[in-house]
C-alpha cells in the first residue's frame, strides 16, 4: 500500500511476458511477468523527478527529496550470492538517503533447491548485505518491504528512499519479521511492518506485505475467509498506528486529506478472486483502489 502524490517517475506494469526495465524520456518503466487479474494494471511511484539515469545495473529516478530505483538480477545461479551483490550495490547507491520501501519479486520463490527454500536463500543474501553495511545495528535501517513470486528467471528489486528520516512501525499482534525464530531459515526476513515519512507539505505512508499471521504463525490454512479477515485486521492495525485509518475507504479520502491510496492483493489461488473482491467491496464500498 502507498499514499503518494506529484508526477510519475517510475511506472510498474503487471502482466508482461518477461521482466523488462527501460527508460522512456523522464520516466523509468518496469514491466513485470506477474499475472494481472483486475484493477489498475500500472502502478506509478510519483516523485517529480529531476533526473532519470542508469547507474550500472540500476535504473534510477531522482528528485530533490526522493530516489527510486530498480534492478533485474539473474537468479539461475546461487541465489544468496546474487541477492547479496544486488543489495550491496543498492545500499551503496542509497548512501545518504533513508530507505522507505523495497518491493521484491523472486522467481520460484517457494521451490526448494540445495535443501533450502529459495525465499530463505533470498533472505540470507539480503541479510548479509545489510549486516556488512550497518553492522550489528542493521535492524534500525530496515525499510518496509514485500517479497512475492514472479515469472521468469530474474529477481526484480525496486526501492524508494528519501532525504527525510522516516518513522518505522511494527504490528503489536505480530513478531517483528527480523526477530523470527530460526525455524524460518538461517536468517530472518529483514523489514519493518510499515514506514511513514512526513515533511511540512507531504506525508508518505508505506505498508509492508501483510498476510494472515498472528505472532509468527500463519492462521486459517484452507479457510479463505479467515485468512482474509486476519489479513485485513493486520492491515487496519497498521494503518491505525500510522495515522491513516481512512486509506481503505475512498469515500473518506477528501475529508481526511488523502490524495491517493493504492493497494496490491496477491493471490496464490486466483479462483478466489471473486470472493475477495466481494468481501472488500462489502467492507469499503469499492475495490477500485486495489490491483490483483
Show which residues each predicted segment covers.
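N-terminal presequence-like segments and the immediate start of the first folded domain
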Residues: 1-292
